A protein has these predicted regions:
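Phosphate- and other anionic-substrate recognition elements at nucleic-acid/protein interfaces
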Residues: 1-135
Length: 135
């Protein structure tokens, strides 16, 4: 099963798992929509699970002033992916956010390459999902 994790904000963290970590990137919001459109039309299968961080599920302390915008973007992505036939799971923000690159390497030691905070957050959302054995 392919799993795509999206950390939504002004920039979207993107992590993709297909038996191994295949991509870890950061996109602008509209770039992300185009990537998802290409992905959904090319793959068009129910064997891909999309994880989207739901901003309102976090603690009050973790919420930012941009919460409303992030929440709207997350809900728009959820509705859009669902309309395209994709499986979506809204997930609670986890405690493994804003890791430094060296800390991130302890969880994904095989990943080589630069990462942004957004990409690492998406990668950790994916890591936690896989660790919990949820499919």
């Amino acid at each position: 099963m392919r799993i795509v994790a999206l950390d939504v904000g002004n920039r979207v963290g993107y992590a993709e798992w297909d038996g191994y970590l295949t991509e870890l990137s950061t996109y602008g919001y509209y770039e992300q929509i185009m990537k998802l459109f290409t992905h959904l039309t090319a793959v068009a299968d129910a064997d891909t699970m999309f994880l989207i961080e739901e901003p309102r599920k976090g603690s009050k302390r973790a919420r930012s002033r941009d919460l409303g915008r992030c929440e709207e973007k997350a809900k728009t992505l959820q509705a859009w992916i669902t309309a395209c036939g994709g499986n979506v799971k809204m997930v609670k923000p986890n405690r493994f956010t804003k890791l430094k690159p060296t800390q991130f390497q302890t969880y994904w030691p095989d990943w080589e390459g630069k990462t942004s905070n957004h990409a690492r957050d998406a990668g950790m959302m994916l890591w936690l999902w896989l660790k919990q054995g949820v499919r």
